[in-house]
């Protein structure tokens, strides 16, 4: 059934409240069910930072865009209504369209006739004026076409001239550059000969001005480069072994005098800095600055910025590349600068061990309680509901576990229950952290596994078993 409805009544229902136009991608707010264009409501939320419905002002929370839902019903209504309107226009369309086409053609013809008449009057001013109603279109069109052909012909004749002039200018530029004479470079052989002559002659030897200014500019620079090579005249070769230095040995007795061997070379040479050599005395000791590294003899060494070596004749040590500085003795004993700052290690280690033990004792303990199937088979106890138990205080004794089982199983006293670990009874006064240590120590090596992050912890829970206390265990506990 088709019904006719006024468009004025329908359009407000299909219009967006923000832009007052028909819906484009109709979207509905899920909280209040008001419909808008998708672009309009998104701009409202994003650009204007509005967190409420523009119509009813309902708060949409922190993320209002998540409350938007595309509404297909409004889109279908819009398509149905506007299709009917378009079909009604198409039915009445051919007549109106033909009339509009004819009117447009008439307008175009009138405009072209006016343009032709105006151009004709301006081109021939001496000709008498013609009445406005008379219009001759074909000859004017031919004249315009001829005029265009002549203009194109003139343009085609002018183009090669312009290009020829441009090419001529481009070709003339490199000729000016080529006309300049290039400076001749001096040959390289005389420079090499001159360098050999400089090496053989003294430094104050002057050059004649007739040889050219280029040699006077180049030679001093190369001579300066050669200076450090010739100035490094050192009596000792770098690859040679350094002089042997014997350090005075300290005797075990403090009262006896030190036995010092004769020193072959009593000077320490610093090759790079060329410092003044220092004589080694009996009251001085060679030490290196690498305090963390100790020599094989146990004494520490101190570097002085260069690389030298030391070797002892008695022990036959290999030379070590070090430089040495002198440090005075105080009362014939070497003073350790770091001795005053060190603290006794024993008290610190004991405190750390106590802290570690306290932290271990404060850790919670996980275990499981299961009924024993090997002990006291005649009177088996039922299982409890809890599969795993966690105790925060690891200093708790086993007697609390017996009380827990007494409550869960409904027994008269805790003495009726016996707790087992690996087929061995557990004493009631034993603490839980000691029980965990016992469980770890008694675990055989093949059964021990390394824990992985994210894996199941069921295999790392201590299993405890409970049963009725038998007479044998009572007699055993009484004898103890």
UniProtKB/Swiss-Prot annotation:
* Composition skew (Basic and acidic residues), residue ranges: 175-193
- What are the boundaries of the RING-type zinc fingers? 16-57
Region called Disordered, residue ranges: 93-133, 167-193, 241-261, 280-356
Q: Does the keyword Zinc apply?
A: yes
Q: Name one GO biological process term.
A: protein ubiquitination
Q: Where is the composition biased (Low complexity)?
A: 113-133
In its UniProt entry, what is this protein called? Probable E3 ubiquitin protein ligase DRIPH
Species lineage: Eukaryota, Viridiplantae, Streptophyta, Embryophyta, Tracheophyta
């Amino acid at each position: 059934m088709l019904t006719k409805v006024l468009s004025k009544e329908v359009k407000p229902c299909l219009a967006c409240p923000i832009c007052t136009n028909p819906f484009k991608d109709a979207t509905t707010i899920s909280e209040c069910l008001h419909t808008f264009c998708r672009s309009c409501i998104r701009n409202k939320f994003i650009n204007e930072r509005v967190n409420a419905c523009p119509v009813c002002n309902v708060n949409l929370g922190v993320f209002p865009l998540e409350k938007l839902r595309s509404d297909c019903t409004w889109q279908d209504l819009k398509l149905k209504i506007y299709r009917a309107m378009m079909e009604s226009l198409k039915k009445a369309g051919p007549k109106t369209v033909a009339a509009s086409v004819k009117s447009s053609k008439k307008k175009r013809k009138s405009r072209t006739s006016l343009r032709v008449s105006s151009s004709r009057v301006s081109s021939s001013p001496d000709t008498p004026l013609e009445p406005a109603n008379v219009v001759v279109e074909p000859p004017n069109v031919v004249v315009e076409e001829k005029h265009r052909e002549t203009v194109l012909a003139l343009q085609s004749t002018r183009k090669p001239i312009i290009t020829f002039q441009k090419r001529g200018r481009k070709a003339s530029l490199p000729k000016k550059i080529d006309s300049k004479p290039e400076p001749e470079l001096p040959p390289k052989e005389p420079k090499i000969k001159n360098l050999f002559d400089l090496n053989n002659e003294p430094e104050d030897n002057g050059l004649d001005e007739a040889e050219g200014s280029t040699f006077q500019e180049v030679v001093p620079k190369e001579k300066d480069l050669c200076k450090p090579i010739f100035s490094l005249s050192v009596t000792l070769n770098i690859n040679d072994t350094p002089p042997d230095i014997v350090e005075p040995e300290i005797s075990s007795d403090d009262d006896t005098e030190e036995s010092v061997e004769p020193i072959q070379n009593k000077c320490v040479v610093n090759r790079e800095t060329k410092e003044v050599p220092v004589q080694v005395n009996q009251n001085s000791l060679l030490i290196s600055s690498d305090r963390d590294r100790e020599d094989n003899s146990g004494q520490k060494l101190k570097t002085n910025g260069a690389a030298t070596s030391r070797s002892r004749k008695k022990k036959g040590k290999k030379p070590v590349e070090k430089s040495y500085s002198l440090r005075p003795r105080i009362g014939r004993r070497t003073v350790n600068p770091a001795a005053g700052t060190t603290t006794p290690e024993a008290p610190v280690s004991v405190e750390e061990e106590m802290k570690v033990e306290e932290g271990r004792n404060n850790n919670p303990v996980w275990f499981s309680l299961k009924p024993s199937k090997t002990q006291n088979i005649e009177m088996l106890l039922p299982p409890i509901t809890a599969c795993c138990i966690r105790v925060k205080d690891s200093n708790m004794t086993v007697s609390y576990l017996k009380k827990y089982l007494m409550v869960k199983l409904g027994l008269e006293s805790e003495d009726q229950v016996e707790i087992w670990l690996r087929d061995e009874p557990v004493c009631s006064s034993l603490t839980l952290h000691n029980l965990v240590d016992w469980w770890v120590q008694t675990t055989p090596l093949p059964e021990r596994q390394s824990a992985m992050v994210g894996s199941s912890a069921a295999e790392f829970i201590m299993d405890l078993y409970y049963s009725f206390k038998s007479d044998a265990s009572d007699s055993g506990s009484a004898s103890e």
